[in-house]
């Protein structure tokens, strides 16, 4: 499979069922978020989830993975950070881990070159029976490459943009949603500081939905902000609680 060596690819499903064309939404499992997206992530969309460490961005992506697999559709999960946890997947699967795992295909690139190879062939990998693609995180290996390659940030940024274009095209052609997660960096203004996704302009340009996962004073409660995009005219704020079983809606009232 391109330049990805076999030891970096863990395939736990070889079920070719062409059902993806009938799938329109992949729910997150969080009612507030799903209602704000009319049921979940739409087929044909590229979606960005970003936030600091421990804000549930990977958990949200894995919940979508579980919900897709339980519909009998395969998920391509590209684990760029090497943090995919079968134990965490089991916790989110509500006693149906074997059923879920059967439909999860895991690819684990070890550097930005291998991530590029995955992006180049992503349409081939998802040709039949897939309902979702997750890339977690799309900026980890990019950030590492920028740090080690002096003076080549522009070229790497352009390559990341090309990867996002490939993923967006795959999503539209295959009519399935794609989710990318991103690390963040600090943005310091005159009155307050905030965070933004790494390679902000590239990621936000391609994203149909953008969800910012923000910590609160209660470390178990996360503020999920669905940001304005060309396809979303109003910002929506939801609160979710991080539990062992996943992210759940919570009320602050």
Enumerate the predicted regions with their spans.
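Detector for small/aliphatic-rich hydrophobic stretches
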Residues: 1-77
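Conserved nucleotide-binding/hydrolysis micro-motifs of P-loop NTPases
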Residues: 81-84, 110-115, 139-141, 184-188, ...
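Phosphate-binding/switch region of NTP-binding enzymes
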Residues: 170-253
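Conserved RecA-like P-loop NTPase ATPase core
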Residues: 33, 49, 89, 104, ...
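Conserved acidic residues
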Residues: 102, 131, 208
